[in-house]
């Protein structure tokens, strides 16, 4: 845990002094890549199971999916790596983690000038550890970031719209089906190129999803009580199963509430014309609130959309505002990210603590 805290404090102090310094940015990108590259198999949820599956995979399709079901592209990648580069699964997972980090950095450079603020949030909000815990999904998302960085999704042309759709579908088919959720990105980007989505509408979506979340929580407790009285039935059992808080996702009732309140604050901070990245982030929070307690994959979808929120939060770090309002926002960002970071370490979501080197 100490290494995570030391890096977080060090990055926080430097970032507040130099939010746009490229030397600092490249240094931490390389550091993060090295940490991901040289971690042991005990760091991250997927590593042990994925490594067992990797050892079975060859270029013969009959050896695929014997332990875990992988998409065909991921099976081929593992087989080719094992055949021609190395039989070490941790080397492949480490390279994927570094690939994820570098493409995230490229994405930040494309869409915000406050690159170190984005990198700080990337680390403190746990998005960096995403590549430790959800290997296929983070790699698929990194491939999409290559496309998002190559084009300007804020000024999406019709031709780029179809390219973006194609890349998302291909990544979803070959590497991880959760990427289908990102099909909303080109549609929202194309819509917002001509029309604005009002802050009031974003508030409405957020509020409705928040109410839906607490309705599910209430159903969970009520049905649990009814179940204890012996009044069981198919409908009751169905309601209980579908109202559980997704413990695997690491999102408790308090944490979802915290995220939702922060999302409302970000909408309030937005100028008259809403930002594409804010809109995408709010969509992610709505997905978390509405469906994250039903299926853990929806909580993972939120983690992807959280990257768009990082861009927005980094952008308004230096927005021209009345002095006090801007400083309150900066303090709020630091408190929000530090609270989630501490929660991440204490609860050890994804088995990232303690950090161990592979050698």
Where are these regions (language model features)?
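Membrane-interface alpha helices of multi-pass inner-membrane proteins
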Residues: 163-176, 182-188, 285-289
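Transmembrane-helix motifs of polytopic, lipid-linked glycan transferases
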Residues: 95-111
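Membrane-interface transmembrane helices that cradle and orient dolichyl/undecaprenyl
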Residues: 144-162
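Transmembrane-helix signature of polytopic, membrane-embedded enzymes
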Residues: 23-26, 108-125
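Membrane-water interface signatures at transmembrane helix termini and the short loops
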Residues: 130-144, 148, 175, 266-318
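Alpha-helical transmembrane segments and terminal signal-anchor/GPI-anchor hydrophobic tails
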Residues: 48-52, 57-60, 75, 185-301, ...
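Loop-to-helix entry region of an early transmembrane alpha helix in multi-pass inner-membrane enzymes
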Residues: 72, 84-99
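Extracytoplasmic catalytic/substrate-binding loops of multi-pass membrane glycan-assembly enzymes
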Residues: 42-50, 65-76
């Amino acid at each position: 845990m100490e290494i995570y805290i030391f890096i977080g404090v060090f990055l926080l102090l430097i970032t507040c002094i130099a939010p746009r310094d490229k030397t600092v940015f490249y240094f931490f990108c390389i550091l993060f890549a090295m940490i991901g590259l040289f971690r042991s198999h005990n760091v991250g949820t997927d590593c042990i199971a994925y490594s067992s599956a990797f050892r079975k995979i060859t270029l013969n399709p009959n050896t695929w999916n014997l332990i875990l079901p992988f998409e065909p592209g991921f099976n081929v990648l593992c087989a080719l790596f094992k055949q021609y580069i190395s039989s070490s699964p941790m080397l492949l997972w480490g390279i994927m983690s570094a690939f994820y980090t570098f493409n995230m950095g490229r994405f930040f450079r494309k869409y915000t000038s406050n690159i170190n603020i984005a990198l700080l949030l990337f680390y403190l909000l746990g998005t960096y550890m995403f590549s430790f815990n959800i290997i296929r999904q983070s790699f698929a998302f990194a491939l999409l970031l290559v496309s998002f960085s190559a084009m300007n999704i804020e000024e999406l042309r019709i031709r780029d719209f179809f390219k973006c759709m194609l890349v998302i579908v291909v990544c979803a088919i070959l590497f991880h089906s959760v990427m289908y959720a990102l099909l909303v990105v080109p549609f929202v980007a194309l819509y917002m190129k001509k029309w604005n989505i009002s802050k009031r509408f974003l508030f409405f979506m957020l509020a409705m999803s928040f109410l839906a979340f607490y309705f599910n929580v209430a159903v969970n407790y009520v049905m649990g009580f009814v179940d204890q009285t012996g009044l069981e039935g198919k409908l009751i059992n169905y309601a209980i199963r579908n109202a559980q808080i997704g413990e695997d996702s690491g999102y408790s009732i308090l944490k979802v509430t915290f995220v939702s309140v922060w999302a409302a604050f970000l909408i309030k901070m937005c100028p008259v014309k809403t930002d594409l990245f804010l809109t995408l982030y709010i969509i992610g929070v709505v997905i978390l609130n509405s469906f994250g307690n039903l299926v853990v994959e929806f909580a993972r979808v939120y983690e992807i959309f959280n990257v768009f929120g990082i861009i927005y939060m980094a952008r308004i770090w230096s927005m021209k505002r009345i002095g006090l309002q801007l400083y309150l926002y900066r303090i709020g960002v630091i408190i929000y990210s530090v609270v989630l970071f501490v929660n991440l370490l204490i609860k050890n979501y994804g088995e990232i603590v303690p950090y161990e080197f592979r050698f």
